[in-house]
Amino acid sequence: MCGIVAIFNVKEQTPELRTKALGMSKKIRHRGPDWSGIHCSGSAILAHERLSIVDPESGGQPLFSPDGKQVLAVNGEIYNHKKIRERYKGRYDFQTGSDCEVILALYREKGVNFLEDLNGIFAFALYDEEQDAFLIARDHIGVIPLYIGYNADGKVFVASELKALEGECERYEPFLPGHYYWSKDPGMKRWYKRDWMEYDNVKDNTASSDAIRMSLCAAVKRQMMSDVPYGVLLSGGLDSSVISAITESYAERRIETDSRSRAWWPRLHSFAVGLKGAPDLAKARLVADHIGTVHHEINYTIQEGLDALRDVIYFIETYDITTVRASVPMYLLARVIKSMGIKMVLSGEGADEIFGGYLYFHKAPSAEEFHKETVRKLSKLHLYDCLRANKSLSAWGVEGRVPFLDKEFLDVAMRTNPKAKMCSVLPASRSGEADPKASIEKRIVREAFEDMLPEEVAWRQKEQFSDGVGYSWIDTLKKITSEAVTDEQMAHAEERFPINTPLCKEEYYYRSIFEEHFPSESAARSVPHEASVACSTAVALEWDEAWKNMNDPSGRAVSGVHENALQGDAVKSVNDIKDKA
């Protein structure tokens, strides 16, 4: 994972402005500790902090077109770059082996109308000195973070993390996923549009577990491209287990040579983190033994987690409760991963949003509401799980890739008939009894990959990551923050925090730390803020009258469902849900 900084509409190139850009870039050097680069020309400055994954010898940035008239700083991975390079064979003189250089070739031919050609994760700033124009863009879901800032003098700032912009520009905001900004026609323009965003376009579609399997396997294989050692995050839940199993099935051959040669690092390493005795750890070990990875189990103590909290909030740049809770163990894990020489990991983010995997989806009143909620969840993912996974890992110079959010796979999964994803329908088995597997969340994914996993994992009920690493972690956070924040402080919370006023003491505590790092109004507004139960959107609170006065993002907040899962009694869980329906 790299880091970028750019300043556009520069009226005069001065040593002071170059020094300023270097200082901004230095604040995000943790994202790219391998090399630093900067280019100043015309009305632009582009700086880059590199984490070398593909073409480590010659892929330094910024990147230049053959005539030097276009310059590019990009944080990302373009998974279909080889196919694009083949299209331009003999027509474009590539200067490096970097996967991201295809952006320049596409821009030279198509102008700004090329973003749909890319399958990857990216955030980039491109300066065209010939036209004195710039283009900024972000990937379809917002896997890669990006912020844009403005000054009254007309300067436009871009950075991978808000810490580079804090105090350097008058206002800034998250750059919207699936959008671009072209200086010749200013303003955010949406480039990523899909028919599946509307329920009417998918309600009569078919559903195929075979299609899910084939498409996800292809996505994982694409995303394994790497010239450095890589691994997988294996929590022991369904999503990470599926990604790990698929990755292991391809790990012996080098993807970059179309599997014609052996992999440079043929043994796949898997990583799990949690408190001792955490639910995730035993299941992760079971999966690792089953698929044959070299497994590493990282234990942390509650005190170690608490000690890291302030640093974690600085790196992840949020005070959202769910994100902070889950980021601490991931941040601690990333440090160990980096110490072992691993620079890239694949993980399972996105599956719960696509397939309705959170426990509250059991309450979806219809297929239409179910589908609309998945679309809402995906539209907000850049503010939650994508942010957590990216920034927790990049704090230690580790890149995270998320095959469930692959652009091609997303189309297959989101065009699947929503009725096949729902977990509230209970078809009878041949014996006439209710089939417990029929009502569990993400059933179509489980059916697609059950032959690759131990049965007790393939059909294990959902645990949120922060719950699964150890329940006492969440309980301690609630207790500590409740004791640290007084009732009087909460009574006057709106006076201290008029923007996104904290809804509970835990949020107040995190917000106070966040404000120490990032005191601006722009920073406060950059964080999402809405009532939630078990990671729901605010809209989904209408599904259950009891949820309207609750605000607990833990999966345990969904009454009756999670307690049964803890007992390991899937049949009882299904029957309880059936009784309540």
Residue spans for each PLM region:
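Short, basic, helix/turn surface patches
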Residues: 125, 320-331, 375-378, 485-491
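Cysteine-centered catalytic environments shared across enzyme families
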Residues: 1-319
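Short acidic/histidine-rich active-site segments
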Residues: 342-352, 358
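ATP-dependent adenylate-handling ligase core
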Residues: 209, 273-334, 360-369, 388-399, ...
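Hydrophobic (often cysteine-bearing) scaffold residues that line and stabilize catalytic clefts
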Residues: 17, 96-99, 118, 205-212, ...
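Glycine-rich beta-strand-to-loop/alpha-helix junction loops that act as flexible
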Residues: 236-237, 347-350, 469
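Short, hydrophobic alpha-helix immediately C-terminal to the catalytic nucleophile
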Residues: 104-105, 241-248, 331-335, 356, ...
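Adenosyl-5′-phosphate
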Residues: 1-4, 339-346, 365-366, 370-581
